[in-house]
Amino acid sequence: MLKASNTSIEEAMRLFNGAGVATGLLVPTETGCRKSIMDATLSFRDFLHESGIHEYSNQSQGPANKVIVPARFVLPDKCVATTASLYRPCTKKGDPRIWFSKLTHYCKPTDLLAVISYGGDMYVFNMSNKEITNAFGIPGSYPHDILSACE
């Protein structure tokens, strides 16, 4: 799904790799953006595991087994609190999924979302939003200060 990104993955990763920050990437499809649901790809599952956030391989299928994780959408001037639901549905062999509450307010289909873990929360950066990517270079902005705190 990453190949559908409307933004250069290499440029986005340069920011996080330069800071030594582990990052998971997601690219919502039109349906995924509309429903706020995305497949948790293998590379994203690896990020969640390595960050100590979640291990899908230990999770049973069905709504009773979903795990809710605090998350934040990062904007240049603020963070918007939300939640991420990590689950394996009863259908489709239980392929791992992630659902962010209010995702439709934060991105468009094919936007590149970079996710980091900090202080037990998931921070979501829309790397297709130039206001957000430009803010990484501005001390005092949320993207800059969060990334600096993670170094």
Show the residue positions of the predicted features:
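Intrinsically disordered, charged low-complexity linkers and terminal tails
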Residues: M1-E151
